[in-house]
UniProtKB/Swiss-Prot annotation:
Gene3D superfamilies: p27
Gene symbol of the encoding locus: Cdkn1c
Protein name in the entry: Cyclin-dependent kinase inhibitor 1C
Keywords in alphabetical order: Cell cycle, Methylation, Nucleus, Protein kinase inhibitor
Taxonomy of the source species: Eukaryota, Metazoa, Chordata, Craniata, Vertebrata
Homology family: Belongs to the CDI family.
Motif extent (Nuclear localization signal): 309-312
Pfam families, sorted: CDI
Amino acid sequence: MGMSDVYLRSRTAMERLASSDTFPVIARSSACRSLFGPVDHEELGRELRMRLAELNAEDQNRWDFNFQQDVPLRGPGRLQWMEVDSESVPAFYRETVQVGRCRLQLGPRPPPVAVAVIPRSGPPAGEAPDGLEEAPEQPPSAPASAVVAEPTPPATPAPASDLTSDPIPEVTLVATSDPTPDPIPDANPDVATRDGEEQVPEQVSEQGEESGAEPGDELGTEPVSEQGEEQGAEPVEEKDEEPEEEQGAEPVEEQGAEPVEEQNGEPVEEQDENQEQRGQELKDQPLSGIPGRPAPGTAAANANDFFAKRKRTAQENKASNDVPPGCPSPNVAPGVGAVEQTPRKRLR
């Protein structure tokens, strides 16, 4: 039953295709009815020859030309064929033959009638040897191509490229060799001097930290600002209890007794005693968890009172010409975030 179903379905499908307008109505062959059975090749051959004969007849009626014999039809018709020279026909309509990579045009044909229309079928077997014989009759095309190919690879461009390539490395070598040796000796002494300069201040700074209060630069610049920051946190009661005369009198007497001045011109012993007093006061005052800083409640009031008293002492020092012009004056407010390493070391 399976084969019968396929047979019926295939037949109905072919009928639908044949009845559609897309395909022309033609005689249905037996090959469609025997797809799943033995094929009759003789019958298929006869149907093919019949179809080709119908196509040839249609072409002859349309062009009045016999494409099988490659001659126009005799007798009156819609089209009149006339003989013309092959050179007058555009190259597009001429027959060509390809030899290797070149395509050559065939010469005039031996038959007397020239055709200006492209034939449907290929040339007959008799014309093949004529075309082969006529192809070698045009030798100028082959030697012309050979002559053109010969001058393309001459030996002249090779030395030209060599000459151009030779001076290029010479120029680059000269350009690279000149500047490179010059900066090398210049850079070495600079680096050596810089290294020496860097090593000297490092040693001096280390010695200054170990010696303590001997160098005047450290005492004149860093400790003053550090003292100012820590003194801003000093409580008011302790400053009120201390007599102001001692602060002003002790440094003056000691200055007259032992005037030891260094680069900044400030007495060293006075600063040492001030730092010792500050250390004792910092030990007595209440701390907020950070060394050198008071509790957050008394910071603002103590700072204002301290700066007011500090300004008076600065005026007295200026009147007595104790502070040289180049050194920072004590009445200047301490910088924000200044270093506090020296006082902390001494407190410890």
